[in-house]
Curated annotation (Swiss-Prot):
GO terms for molecular function: 3-dehydroquinate synthase activity; metal ion binding; nucleotide binding. This is 3-dehydroquinate synthase. InterPro entries: Dehydroquinate_synthase, DHQ_synth_AroB, DHQ_synth_fam, DHQS/DOIS_N, DHQS_C. It is found in: Cytoplasm. Catalyzes the conversion of 3-deoxy-D-arabino-heptulosonate 7-phosphate (DAHP) to dehydroquinate (DHQ). Zn(2+) binds at residues 186, 249, 267. CDD domains: DHQS. NCBIfam families: aroB (TIGR01357).
Amino acid sequence: MITTIPVGLGARAYDVVIGTGLIDRAGEHIAPLLKRKRVAIVTDTIVGEHHGERLANALEHAGVATDVILVPPGEETKSFEGLADLSDRLLALGLERGDMVIAFGGGVVGDLTGFAAAIYKRGIDFIQIPTTLLAQVDSSVGGKTAIDTPRGKNLIGAFHQPRLVLADLDILATLPARELACGYAEVIKYGLLGDFAFFEWLEANVHAVLERDTAALVKAVGRSVEMKAQIVAEDEREVGRRALLNLGHTFGHAVEGEMGFGDALKHGEAVGLGMAQAFRFSVRQGLCSAQDAARAEAAIKAAGLPTKLSDIRPEPFSADALIAHTAQDKKAQGGTLTFVLVRAIGDAFVAKDVDRQALRAFLVEEGAV
């Protein structure tokens, strides 16, 4: 079963192909896009060990010469050091502008490789082959590329659209359960921000998705990508509606920053927590019903995701430190705080100039000090 979803960006439009067996048929999808039959595959050591040879063989069978660059797994790779190392290795290979880079991995590999492609010789084409649920439904689509800095997540980056996204659902079979739950956080986000019917379907099918039922994954990934593709086509540079895709991310990134962007708290877990907090803060501000917030929280918790600060660690967080992280958020303008809040499940909006004292009081209620 193959589903193709177009991302309509005029001359830079591309397809997101979703289905099974796509890695083994990667050559037939990728070879026609190449000016010169040469690619560099960037992958981490874990994905490379499990699937790298399959992808390289599929490409070579289509007459494409391949080089493989291995990077360490984990968020720490998305750094200035990681970017410099990858850029140097691409230069050492002598890649030309007519060649292609393939990001074969999760969100970290996709973000890092996409940014390196954006700046390599002022821009080289790249393809996303996402290997995690989170990357398939979110980070591989839309052209956002970035690295982290000690001051925050994804603060240095560029918009650089891929030429193609291949989302092979078979590869999710080897994904650890924790990573699958992290991806589910981004799936349920789409229902919470703008599709109540999809949210209801997820309530009823969360276990089918997490048990990797193929039909459930086709629906979950397909609807998520449809929504993201539509929003990106309307607002590529996030000057308007695309900001809604950050539901849960401002709260979540703040907690990630305090936790050091490591494996103690993964990005999807932070987003799950952040969405629950966004609903509760919306209730506190008189924007959303407590019933909707409780229902959203229950749906997030059903996937085994954290919904409270105390789920992350027993020691309390500093409210002031969390607020300082939100001030570094990319949505912030004129020194004010900007959050994606909700009126109801399926009805999110961008709230500008959020009151710092109200936010601090809320975080104290949440257990911060």
